């Protein structure tokens, strides 16, 4: 019953939003001049971004966008994949309809990005095993970001 009530109130979205706020406030948000330093945050956020909303069509205040709204509105982080591919939607999971894996960095580090992509090839394309129902090699695709640190 509690789980259904939480689902009805989008509790998972709100919880993840509080988590990202805590993470950002206690890392990049706790440092003076962080926007001028080399900072990076990446991973499976299990949430969608307003930068991809042309793909999803959520209303502006939808809770599914809370996590990345916080990052984009309250930190100096840049979404590396979307910034390198502004007119293209590149999914990061096997269902091909969602991007929930992100690489963020500050401008001084972003300026050193040579290339960035989500890798879809014969090896990385997720395949669901009919016996175990697990994805091989993973249900998420690798994200490759190449930096010139010279």
Regions found by a protein language model. Name each.
Residues 1, 43-46:
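Short loop/turn segments at strand-loop or loop-helix junctions that form parts
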Residues 1-20, 54-56:
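Surface-exposed cleft-lining segments at the edges of enzyme active sites
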Residues 11-24, 62-64, 137:
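Soluble or luminal CAZymes and related metallo-dependent hydrolases
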Residues 21-25, 43, 69:
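Internal, well-ordered alpha-helical scaffold/interface segments
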Residues 29-40, 47-150:
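Metal-dependent phosphoester-hydrolase catalytic domains
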């Amino acid at each position: 019953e509690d789980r259904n009530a939480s689902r009805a109130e989008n509790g998972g979205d709100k919880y993840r939003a509080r988590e990202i706020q805590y993470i950002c406030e206690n890392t990049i948000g706790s440092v003076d001049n962080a926007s001028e330093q080399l900072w990076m945050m990446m991973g499976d956020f299990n949430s969608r971004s307003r930068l991809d909303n042309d793909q999803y069509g959520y209303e502006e205040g939808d809770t599914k966008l809370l996590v990345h709204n916080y990052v984009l509105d309250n930190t100096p982080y840049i979404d590396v994949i979307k910034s390198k591919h502004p007119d293209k939607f590149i999914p990061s999971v096997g269902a091909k309809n969602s991007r929930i894996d992100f690489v963020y960095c500050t401008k001084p580090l972003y300026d050193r990005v040579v290339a960035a992509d989500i890798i879809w090839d014969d090896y990385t394309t997720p395949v669901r095993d009919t016996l175990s129902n697990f994805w091989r090699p993973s249900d998420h695709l690798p994200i490759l970001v190449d930096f010139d640190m010279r």
